[in-house]
A protein has these predicted regions:
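Short glycine/proline-enriched loop/turn "hinge" motifs that connect secondary-structure elements
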Residues: 115, 157, 208-214, 272-277, ...
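Short beta-strand segments
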Residues: 107-109, 166-168, 196-200, 220-222, ...
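Acidic-glycine-rich active-site phosphate/pyrophosphate-binding loop
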Residues: 111-125, 208-220, 355
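Glycine/charged-rich beta-loop-alpha catalytic/anionic-binding loops adjacent to active sites
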Residues: 121-134, 222-225, 358, 395-396
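Acidic/histidine-rich catalytic neighborhood of metal-dependent amide-processing enzymes
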Residues: 129, 134, 138-212, 254, ...
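Acidic/His- and Gly-rich active-site-bordering loop/insert found
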Residues: 2-131
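Metal-dependent amide/peptide-bond hydrolase catalytic core
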Residues: 1-32, 49, 53, 237-434
């Protein structure tokens, strides 16, 4: 998650939501829950270290998923199960029960990491800090989710809507949000999750309410190849990519909605005196607008078509007598598609988290980023992504770290937000808040 600058022109927090949050924070039950958080930090750290020592590369999360399912059972969640793609579920009832057609508040955290299975997982603790791959992203998020689940089963808090806890797979890299895609495409969940709170990484200073979309492609150009002397004139895939890149990168992009592109990888050829048989590149397109991403994708495809035509014609002019076949083939392979979306400024979930931050005197910015929340936001559903508290750094490196100082604030923030959305002590849960 790499946030960009905050939303502007947010409306005032709905007074009714602010009153609800203040009432919740002052209740004896919630004060008891806050005390539970203070006394259980050693358990949270133990869980975080245990989990971080279990490899969970993209498409290889099963061992960590099994560990999380066992922890869900251990803390007492209901209906613990693992779905077809590896997502882990556990439920906690509201006083309205689990009836047919019931709406849920979802708390999720991705269990995968960017690191391959062969990565040494040398997790160590030094004071309040943990060090090692994945301890923050997303060790902090999963630990926070597990801590909230354990708290709710230990300190009974009355709320209307049931909660579903989800450890989802496939957030990082080539996972391409596959876990959340699966959840929001299944009949069981796509229409029954009223609000989604996604926990991603450490911190308590951001609220992601806008989904940064991205489309990624691998482009492969193939030609006849040959010797640089005897086969001079044959179309050159590297030249085709160079021409396409020159045309594509000259395309204008808007500053609002912000839209970007990048050529991140380019490969081709075997030696200086060989005409390559193939060349490839990887392209990243990002925007907060689906329409802008589609426009840039079309621009890329047109640039490639033009480059193929130009190089084919140039090859014919260079050597009208060439004996080698001159056919050129260009393939554009999608390797990532994260949809864009935006939470309405008046959405109840945004009022709730902002009211909680005001209650806790916590300064947080509303931002955009690419997270698991992209999926529900792109479907027009209410979702945010926030951190699991504490602080962290070195994400996606072997030097990653997490500091538990400040975790308690993050957990209070998560708990109050869930209770506000689930209608704690309020039979009118699930309304608009106004």
């Amino acid at each position: 998650m790499s946030p960009t600058p905050p939303h502007a022109d947010l409306p005032d927090i709905a007074p009714a939501v602010q009153r609800d949050v203040a009432r919740l924070a002052a209740s004896p039950e919630v004060r008891s829950a806050f005390n539970w958080l203070r006394t259980h930090e050693p358990q949270l750290t133990q869980w975080q270290m245990e989990m971080a020592r279990i490899a969970a590369p993209p498409f290889g999360e099963s061992a960590r998923g099994a560990w999380l399912a066992e922890r869900f059972r251990q803390v007492g969640l209901d209906d613990v199960r693992i779905d077809d793609v590896g997502n882990v579920f556990g439920s906690h009832p509201g006083f309205m029960g689990y009836g047919v057609g019931q709406r849920y508040v979802a708390l999720s955290a991705h269990i995968d990491t960017v690191f391959p299975a062969s990565t040494p997982l040398n997790i160590r603790q030094q004071g309040s800090r943990l060090y090692g791959p994945g301890v923050s992203d997303n060790g902090a998020g999963v630990t926070a989710m597990l801590g909230i689940a354990a708290l709710l089963r230990s300190v009974r808090l009355r709320h209307a809507l049931p909660l579903v806890f989800i450890g989802n797979v496939g957030e990082e890299g080539e996972g391409d949000l596959r876990g959340m895609r699966h959840i929001f495409s299944t009949p069981r969940w796509k229409d029954s999750i009223a609000y989604s709170v996604v926990l991603d990484g450490a911190g308590s200073d951001t609220v992601v309410a806008e989904a940064l979309g991205s489309r990624r492609f691998e482009v492969i150009v193939r030609g006849p190849g040959g010797h640089s002397w005897s086969d001079f004139g044959a179309p050159n895939p590297v030249v085709i990519l160079a021409k396409a890149i020159d045309t594509f990168t000259a395309a204008p992009v808007p500053t609002g909605p912000k839209t970007t592109f990048n050529i991140g990888v380019i490969r081709g050829g075997t030696s200086v005196n060989s005409i390559p048989e193939s060349a490839s590149m990887k392209v990243d397109i990002r925007s907060t607008s689906m329409a802008e991403m589609e426009r840039l994708e079309q621009t890329l495809r047109l640039a490639l078509n033009r480059a193929v035509e130009d190089e084919t014609m140039a090859a014919e002019m260079r050597s009208s007598l060439q004996k080698r076949p001159s056919g050129v083939h260009c393939e554009v392979i999608p390797i990532g598609n994260r949809p864009a979306g935006e939470l309405a400024a008046g959405a109840r979930i945004l009022h709730a988290i902002r009211a909680v931050d005001a209650q806790l005197n916590n300064a947080a910015q509303v931002q955009r980023a690419s997270t698991d929340a992209n999926i529900p936001l792109s479907l027009g559903q209410e979702a945010i992504a926030i951190g699991g508290g504490g602080s962290g750094g070195g994400a996606h490196t072997l030097q990653e770290w997490f500091d538990s100082n400040g975790r308690e604030l993050g957990l209070k923030r998560i708990l109050l937000t869930l209770l506000a959305l689930a209608g704690a002590g309020d039979s009118g849960a699930g309304g608009s808040g106004e």
